[in-house]
Design a protein with these regions (language model features):
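Active-site recognition of the HExxH zinc-binding catalytic motif
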Residues: 65-77
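Metalloprotease/metallohydrolase-associated module, dominated by Zn2+-dependent proteases
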Residues: 1-42, 46, 78-142
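Short pre-active-site segment immediately N-terminal to the catalytic Zn-binding motif
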Residues: 41-44, 50-68, 97-98
Length: 142
């Protein structure tokens, strides 16, 4: 089993995300093969300025929907202070994982923006083609 390490976001992916999101993403570290994600039983989990992946960053970067879902958590929730560990746990206790407001918001954000990110990535030279299953059924569990 590999141990976690920071992965570089490919330039084409970074450019497309920044164009769509309207802000820089360079301060967000992507950690692949993370024990933290594995401990949480998640494909990915986030914290302030961090996306922790169970698997490879290469696979993550080919999935526009999942990238948007995770970057939404980091940029629109953790970074603004609306998402904290205690708030997330309370939401899960009150509403369950699927219906907690942070997951609902991230799924809606990804649903709304994935087609545009898919197009931006497809139009970018030297980008990997988006993953055919661009919207996983359970996205990521926190």
């Amino acid at each position: 089993m590999r141990s976690g390490r920071e992965a570089a976001v490919p330039g084409a992916v970074s450019g497309a995300l920044e164009r769509l999101l309207g802000e820089r993403i360079g301060h967000v570290k992507v950690i692949e093969y993370s024990w933290f994600a594995r401990v949480h039983g998640a494909f990915a989990t986030t914290r302030l300025h961090r996306i922790y992946l169970r698997g490879s960053a290469a696979e993550f970067f080919t999935n526009p929907w999942l990238m948007l879902h995770e970057y939404c958590h980091v940029l629109r929730q953790w970074q603004t202070g609306s998402l904290t560990a205690p708030r997330y746990l309370l939401e899960c206790l009150l509403h369950g994982y699927w219906n907690n407001r942070f997951e609902v918001e991230a799924r809606e954000f990804a649903d709304h923006n994935a087609p545009q990110l898919h197009s931006l990535l497809a139009a970018t030279p030297h980008s990997s083609p988006p993953h055919p299953d661009a919207q996983p059924s359970s996205a990521s569990r926190r």
